[in-house]
Swiss-Prot record:
It holds the Pfam family DUF5396. A lipid is attached at residue 25 (S-diacylglycerol cysteine). A lipid is attached at residue 25 (N-palmitoyl cysteine). It comes from Mycoplasma pneumoniae (strain ATCC 29342 / M129 / Subtype 1) (Mycoplasmoides pneumoniae). Residues 119-130, 249-260 have a biased composition (Low complexity). GO terms for cellular component: plasma membrane. It is found in: Cell membrane. The keyword Membrane applies. Gene3D superfamilies: Dipeptide-binding Protein, Domain 1 (3.90.76.10). Residues 111-137, 242-267 are annotated as: Disordered. It is a lipid-anchor. The keyword Lipoprotein applies. This is Uncharacterized lipoprotein MPN_459. Keywords: Cell membrane, Lipoprotein, Membrane, Palmitate, Signal.
Length: 569
């Protein structure tokens, strides 16, 4: 198989518009794409391969997972032999879901028109006793098939998107149950009866539960997404109904000599919470309930915190608290906090350090063939390519093919100069060229066609970054900066609640014209409760260009950012 040349520049999330990059080496001839990172793969990452984690799974293992939705970067590359100009656009599409319906609660007037006999015979959704008669469909999205020629569109381009995002408080996803989970050999997993294990709505429910439980135990520091979207946890993954629709437990209270029954809620952190008691009663339907409409729900479902994990896997069933659980907690001020020292991370799905991959299944574009302290080897997942890939939008080049094998090397503390040397030695498929090596790179590669200026001309790509809550860590008696952030970022995070930091954060918010952004995203609403910073928001300008300050008439020299773009999105 012949590969298209890859161009990989060191582009920051604030849109540095050009970089020098090298690509194409002997590794490509073996149908292998090799990259390297300065990260320490397992440092402070006790559960690297599931939603029950400290740092985001996507940092290293995003390729083995897939979500209800995903973003696909589409566009074009123009190569004139000297420069490569990239024009990209992100498209939000359904991935493991074949369709989604948005519902809103019917008004009380409409509900009262239902007679008691009709209400009693209505079908239950299996979620907190609610019935279909209580809900009204506001719109739906269906996965676009490649044969119909319209699978290049984003969900956001559909006429129903605005209505769903602004009104829906229940999202019903239809799951593609034809795709099978595969093991670390790329073979479909079989259960104890010899049946191949297929994707189920219960896999998403367990993924949600693992993330929520981890957050409640103060282990996962990204639990704010639950509050941000306004997830109704009880209706989505709660446990107030038994497997057969029977009530799990009731409390009986005496009030004025009258016996009143009251259903007791069992929290996810309770020892008697049953992880095999599912809200999802059908394998192909998964319902997400919100307390109020959240316009970015479909976008957020592409994040790794909401990916599925195989609910039949023994180590997935072990993600709970209580007797015989590998999770150990301490109680403080009525809150349960995970005891990381006593917890047996080997006993839960995705945990166990370098051994985690051995029994981790995949439903994404790649599976993990091997994994150790220094590298991860990914192999392309045929199941994904058979069922999902054909209906995804084409990326930059219509004839490009997926890479069969990817190898990610980890060299903690390595500098760009080290990666450049590795590329020269034939160990990497691509490398960014730092300023100090540009002259050497020109002399070595200018005539080979491997050296290019990569220019991002226009993008419509969003970037979200979540930082660790531990900017500094203790190694022995030495306090060091956490490996995933810079010293400047660590200082900012360490003092994030100080008066100076709060002033800076307020200033950053002031740079965004929220009213204009709301008009673009929510034309019928004045509210906005989630924001993203587009890739390429700032434009580069020459050192000798003078820019007039907004509303002042003063000039400024030497800045690499056009000041006008501080006020635009």
């Amino acid at each position: 198989m012949k590969f298209q040349r890859k161009y990989w520049g060191l582009l920051s999330t604030l849109g540095v518009s050009s970089a020098v990059a090298l690509s194409a080496c002997a590794a490509q001839a073996r149908d292998v794409y090799v990259t390297s990172s300065a990260s320490d793969l397992l440092k402070n990452n006790l559960v690297p391969m599931s939603m029950f984690n400290v740092s985001p799974t996507s940092s290293f293992f995003g390729s083995k997972y897939a979500g209800l939705t995903t973003y696909i970067a589409t566009g074009s590359n123009k190569d004139d032999g000297v420069n490569v100009t990239s024009q990209t656009q992100e498209k939000l599409v359904l991935e493991l879901a074949t369709s989604v319906k948005g519902y809103k609660k019917k008004t009380s007037t409409a509900s009262n028109m239902k007679t008691a006999s009709v209400s009693s015979s209505s079908s239950s959704t299996g979620n907190n006793g609610s019935t279909e008669d209580e809900w009204e469909v506001v719109g739906s999205e269906i996965k676009r098939e490649s044969g119909k020629g319209d699978n290049g569109k984003s969900i956001t381009e559909d006429s129903n998107f605005q209505t769903i995002s602004q009104q829906a408080t229940r999202y019903e996803f239809t799951i593609d149950t034809s795709i099978k989970w595969v093991d670390n050999n790329g073979k479909p997993v079989k259960d104890e009866k010899g049946q191949e294990v297929k994707l189920s709505s219960k896999d998403f429910e367990r993924g949600f539960e693992a993330y929520i439980l981890s957050s409640e135990l103060r282990f996962n520091r990204n639990g704010y997404f639950i509050d941000l979207m306004g997830l109704d946890v009880e209706k989505t993954v709660g446990m107030t109904n038994g497997k057969n629709g029977t009530q799990v437990k009731k409390m009986t209270t005496d009030s004025s000599s009258t016996q009143q029954s009251e259903e007791k809620k069992i929290e996810i952190t309770d020892d008697n919470y049953d992880p095999e008691d599912y809200r999802s009663t059908s394998d192909d339907k998964f319902n997400v309930y919100l307390t109020s409409p959240f316009p970015f729900l479909l976008s957020m479902m592409s994040k790794e915190f909401f990916f599925p994990i195989p609910h039949t896997h023994p180590k997935v069933k072990a993600i709970k608290v209580g007797p015989n659980s590998p999770l150990v907690y301490n109680e403080k001020n009525s809150a349960k906090i995970l005891d990381q020292t006593k917890t047996n991370f080997d006993g839960i799905y995705g945990g166990g350090g370098v051994n985690a991959w051995r029994d981790a299944w995949s439903v994404g574009p790649y599976y993990v063939e091997s994994f150790n302290q220094s590298q991860i080897v990914f192999k392309r997942n045929k199941e994904y390519d058979d069922h999902i890939t054909p209906n995804l939008p084409k990326t930059r080049e219509g004839n490009e093919q997926p890479i069969p094998t990817m190898i990610n090397y980890f060299q903690p503390g390595a500098t760009p100069e080290v990666f450049y040397s590795n590329y020269i030695a034939g160990g990497l498929s691509s490398a960014g060229v730092s300023y100090s090596q540009q002259e050497d790179a020109r002399s070595r590669f200018a005539s080979t066609g491997d050296l290019r200026w990569v220019k991002v001309q226009k993008t419509a790509q969003s970037a979200q970054i979540t930082y660790s809550s531990r900017p500094y860590i203790l190694e022995g008696e030495t306090v060091k900066t956490n490996s995933n952030i810079t010293e400047t970022e660590a200082k900012f995070l360490y003092n994030s609640e100080s008066e100076e930091a709060l002033t800076i954060r307020a200033g950053i918010n002031g740079l965004i014209n929220w009213q204009n952004l709301a008009i673009i995203l929510l034309p019928n609403s004045g509210d906005l409760n989630y924001s993203i910073v587009p890739f390429g928001i700032f434009k580069e300008k020459g050192k000798d260009v003078q820019v007039k300050q907004k509303n002042t008439g003063q000039a400024s020299q030497g800045s690499d950012l056009m000041n006008d773009y501080y006020y635009k999105i």
